[in-house]
Amino acid sequence: DYSEGAHPSVLEAISEHNFETTCGYSMDPFCRHTADTVRELTDCPDADVHFIVGGTLANTIVISAALRPWEGVIAATTGHINVHETGAIESSGHKVCAIEATDGKLTPALVRKVMRIHCDGKDEHMVLPRMVYISDATELGTIYTKAELAALYEVCREYDLYLFLDGARLPAALVAQGNDLDITDFGKYCDAFYIGGTKNGLLFGEALVITNDSLKPHFRNMIKQRGGMFAKGFLFGVQFDAYFKDGLWLDMARHAVTQAQRIAKAAQEKGYTLYAQSPTNQVFVVLSHEKIAELEKNFAFEAFGHVDDDHEAMRFVCSWATKPEAVDALIE
């Protein structure tokens, strides 16, 4: 879902404002306007809004800013920060306290288990968990319900933990069948979260929303120190303004999810097993080595997990730009 450029409306907006002279580092009128749009959209009038180029950088900056040197972050073993960020969090000096989670989703019971392992944060010889990291959708394409998110928020309050939500694929989660979360719910139940754009039709960009006042001071200093202070920041504002206009961001996500679910439905009808029950724009299909070799001649997809000596789980991802006829060809 980051394999194409950007939606034509986004490119048109960039072209329209290309020769305008603005302040750098997201201090321009476009970013200020779009930040206000995000506050209104999320019903977080007092939130700080920052724009970051991509997900790994956003995760690293938020976690680095929130944690003291002896503190760590709880995540599922399949969590992006644990397996797909090349140790970015650890390189900043913070341990990822990973735990096995069904369908990639953390629960209050799992958080409590990690806290017990770490002596509820009372042993100075151990890392002190201080944050819970989740993503919606998860790495397995699964989504959280409102009740699940609220329950995680409550256990985080119980243990004085921050709850941080990676929203790189949040648009896809919001339009997925079975979702009961509204964009306004994340401001209620998360200390920080972001709305992904890179994987949903922007050239680049994640809109980070910080609701917890304790995380706000000097956050731009951390952005700069971690290499995230984008000089041509006005491009964030211009892109996201087009993104949110007339619900384009959700329309793009719906297209991606619709095409992906066509693949999921067809795979099951043809007798294939799904590795994970994902209602989003990611589909995980268990395939034989022979079928993988056959499909690789004409299609691009990714190995996701080993199943047995003869089968692997393969990940197929659709985007805002996936052509229905391409899905037809894969199904055939």
What are these regions (language model features)?
Residues 7-54, 77-82, 88:
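Conserved N-terminal alpha-helix of the aminotransferase class I/II PLP-enzyme fold
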Residues 65-83, 112:
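Conserved PLP-anchoring active-site segment centered on the Schiff-base-forming lysine
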Residues 69-70, 261-331:
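Conserved C-terminal alpha-helix-loop-beta "cap" of PLP-dependent enzymes
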Residues 73, 96-97, 163-165, 274, ...:
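Hydrophobic beta-strand scaffold residues
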Residues 93-139, 144-151:
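PLP-dependent aminotransferase-class I/II
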Residues 102, 128-130, 135-138, 143, ...:
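Active-site C-terminal subdomain of aminotransferase-like
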Residues 144-176:
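Catalytic PLP-binding core of fold-type I/II PLP enzymes
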